[in-house]
Design a protein with these regions (language model features):
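Long, charged all-alpha helical bundle/coiled-coil segments in cytosolic proteins
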Residues: 51-101
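N-terminal juxtamembrane/topogenic regions of multi-pass membrane proteins
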Residues: 1-16
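Acidic, proline/serine/threonine- and glycine-rich low-complexity intrinsically disordered segments
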Residues: 181-183
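Charged, well-structured binding/catalytic surfaces in domain cores that contact anionic ligands
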Residues: 83-143
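Amphipathic alpha-helical coiled-coil segments
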Residues: 12-29, 33-36, 40-57, 61, ...
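Conserved small/polar residues in nucleotide/adenosyl-binding loops
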Residues: 185-191
Length: 195
């Protein structure tokens, strides 16, 4: 990225301010990147943990697969999922507060005995599935913010700060040359030939 500037004191002052601003902001942005990196790892680990727990729960009840055919799917429905927002390093992330289920009344005497257990199993599976999705979304949001922050750090470190320093150096050299012009008028002819 080429920095546009003019060879004058005003431009020199503006570039100096821009350089100082970026140099002051860089440590803050780096610490944000570090915090986001650790939060992404935590969210990824939590999502993986919920995924493993859900898989274990499914595996525990694989023996009931033949029974699920007679289970009435309308017995249980998710009524509400309560989410709140938590800011982590300036990024708004979802936090699961509560999952509310609606259980349709059923006759305990005419329905199979395991229906009550089936409703509990489905509640736990749904709860784990929703928690997994929330942590997965949290991880995606944090990872996106981390990538953007990393890009900004790289832009500042590798492009803008060196560019501003180079522009300031060029302006200073130009201004020094303007102030101290080289004059050959004081040299005599024999001196010029000796040089």
């Amino acid at each position: 990225m080429a920095i546009k500037f003019q060879y004058n004191k005003t431009s020199l002052g503006d570039l100096g301010k821009q350089l100082k601003m970026r140099q002051k902001a860089l440590p803050t942005i780096k610490s944000k990147e570090s915090a986001l990196r650790s939060e992404v790892k935590k969210a990824k680990d939590s999502a993986g943990d919920y995924r493993r727990r859900l898989d274990r729960l499914k595996a525990e009840y694989d023996y009931m697969v033949s029974l699920w055919g007679e289970f009435d799917c309308d017995l249980l429905r998710i009524a509400d999922v309560e989410l709140s927002v938590q800011k982590i390093a300036g990024v708004r992330t979802p936090v699961l507060q509560d999952v509310k289920f609606e259980v349709k009344p059923y006759d305990l005497f005419s329905s199979p005995v395991w229906f009550a257990d089936g409703v509990d199993i489905l509640k736990r599976m749904a709860q784990l599935g929703i928690e997994f999705e929330v942590y997965n979304r949290k991880m995606e949001l944090l990872d996106y913010a981390r990538r953007k922050t990393t890009q900004k750090v790289n832009l500042y470190e590798k492009v803008q700060i060196p560019g501003y320093e180079d522009a300031i150096r060029k302006i200073k050299r130009f201004m020094e040359d303007e102030e101290n012009p080289v004059s050959y008028t004081h040299l005599t002819l024999p001196t010029i030939l000796l040089v």
